[in-house]
Amino acid sequence: MDKQWFPAAGILLAALLVVSASTLTLLSTNEDPEQFPSAPGTSAQQSSRILLGILTDVTGGINSVEREPEALGRRAGGLSTEGAGGQESPSMPGPSGRVIPEPIPSALTTSASDMASQPVSSGADPIEEIMALGTLETITMSSPQPSPRHESEQKFDKVFRLCGTVPASETLEKNVASKPAWHLIKAPPPPIFSRSPHLLWCTPNSTVYIPVPAWRDGHSRPEASSSVPLAPSTSLGLPIFPWMPNILKATESLLPASPGRSGLDLTSQVGSRASENTVALDTGPVSRGTSVLLLPSATSPSQASSLHSPRPSSASPLSASPSPAALSFFPSPASILVLVSSVTTGASDSPKAPVSVIAPSTTDSFIKTSNLGPQIALQPSHPGLWLPTSPIHMPTLSLQHFSSPPSTAHSSGFTESSVHADPTLASTLPHPGQDMSLQDLSFSTGGRSHTTHSVTFRINSNRFTKAVWNLVPLERWLLNRLICYQLRFIYQEAFPNFRNVSTLLFRPGCPEVKASLIFGPPDPSSIEILWTLYRKVKSSRWSLGYLSLADHGLSSAGYSMTDLTQEIINISFTLMRPFLPQLLLPSSQSCILLEKQTIQLVTHEVSRFYKAELQSQPLLLFSNVKEWVSVYMEYKFKSPIPIRLQGLASHLAHHITDPTLQKSSIMANGEKADLVFYEMWLLILGHPFTKTLENKTSSECQELRGLLTRQLTSVLQPLKNFGQVVVEEFHQEPLTARVQTAFFGAVPAQAIIQDTVLQALGSLQETEGLQLEMLLPVLGTPSSRASRGPRGGAMLNLQRFTSLFVLVALCTAPPFINKQALYLS
């Protein structure tokens, strides 16, 4: 009794499916043949074939129950012929010629096929499919574009199916803006891989958004979604993710199709440390605009599981449909990966698609990594670091590998190869000793109006070499983006004709990085490019972002730091103003303001001394020297100059009149100004000593120093060859001030200096109420003649007479008048 109604139920179900398929076929005939169905699964005509395949499976199941395979098989064959309009069923024949029914499709397959079979008008908006993830059996189909004349003659070239298992609690959304044609994917009935493989979607070269749930240790993250925009005009449309194995690219032309088989037969294996799953691609003719997108596995805890990227408002329609392809998974200990993609050039006579191949490595070779530019944010599946869910602009990497370097070698020891390598070269896997680079294909070829220059620098980090050798870890992605961003920022600010950073070349086991820069006309010189990077890196305390660089590893196209030092001058001096910690931050307001003032103060005099035009902005550094601001500057000129010309320090000391610049501290190209110093100690009576006077940054110290400096300068300035008065410091018990007076060349007689200073001290007592006594004058040696001894016994010992002068001053001083001293800020 339980089995008697099965034939009737099967017949009713078959009739219902045939009616639905016939209706959909009739509706699809009214559509424009040039339009592709918007569903990512199938077209309307292909949906009928899928339904007929499902019908065959259901009928086969009923046959096994009722033990009537022959009768029901003939009935199902008749229904298939009637519903498809004379077209063949996609069922696979067995060895004996008998149709072998496939396993009954899951609910996901049936629902996806039903949804994909709905007719879509040419002006309809992109639809959104929501498929619950259970035991996933994804079926996609593709056939040549239907022709209105020979529609009944169309057949499948190749069909296949990909089976995979993902958690049933997750949700997979696919938003497809264009209308591509899809391939039928079939897999061998017995799954022979040990764990769930990565889902492989064969998509046209358009913007496809595939939100994928993020898995971490078996826990789901429903909010994690992704969209992967595929670049429409790149030489290789293969996004590479951190969980993927080492992927190397060798550009090859497709082989001609063999008789009885359409397209190229490529069988290869893929493997890594974490997995020995293998992918074999069996493709037909690859059309333009086709790319392969690999999605992460749901069960691999060591692989990244989601991508994040904002969705654009619209997507461009497709220009070509993808070609059939076949996939199969099988394990193998030794593995290589073959990825097939096509080049989208936009021209009708575009070359054939390149083939990416990996093979075991046996020789030293050179690797390039291409930065294709889609916006991708990675989220690792392993415990620990989690990235924010907000999008991050990350490059899509593919590796380019060449077994032999070019004939020309660079001075830095790097070797470079063209983006389009010789297809006859054997590709090998990387190993220590190879060179590897990241390449941005948007400007990989400069063209006639562009030129390429290179710069090399060293990174002071032991972790750097370890991160670089792992070909596709997250650290490499972040490192690539950081370096490219910093270099673009530096050169875009200095050169309006700068275009892009095309290549980053890494040497495993070595901290050197070589960057290729693209410039438009006019072409800058290599020494200018080196100077620009040197100025920015040194002004940032030898850092590039958060990377610390070595101070001896910069070079550009054969020019090293030794060559650069031949064309620059350096100047250092001290500004007698309190040092602020903000001056160590180049972007702080205090640093920007002081930098502007200093450049205006010095640049004009430097240009006037050499009578030459300077190269852009100088290098400027601030540091702390005894609580004052120490300034270090470097200038480069646009034309060669006699940089060893002496006298620049004396020229600056004569012509810079800013009282805050300490003339005795000026040094240019290792040369000091030609000055002679007259030093004296002043005893300050009636003024209490406080600890704040020992701090040069305190307001009390600055007020008292300013008062003494102005008063002494006013009385000493009329003297011949007067240079500057500097109150160096204050000492306690008793309160004394050390004062240094600088003169250019010959110094006036000591008696004249003492008389002039005594006049200034009397004036201070009358105007400010300060009583000062000059303890001991000391005549020093010229700063530019340090080897010369003191003049004629003029150097006296201060320690011997200090107590005597203090005693005399205290005994002979008049009664102290309590009067508030007026301090000038």
Swiss-Prot record:
Signal peptide range: 1-21
UniProt entry tagged with the keyword Signal: yes
UniProt tissue specificity: Expression is restricted to circumvallate papillae.
Region feature Disordered, mapped onto this chain: 66-97, 299-322
Biased composition (Low complexity): 302-322
Keywords (A to Z) from UniProt: Signal
Keyword Signal attributed: yes
Protein name as catalogued: Taste receptor cell protein 1
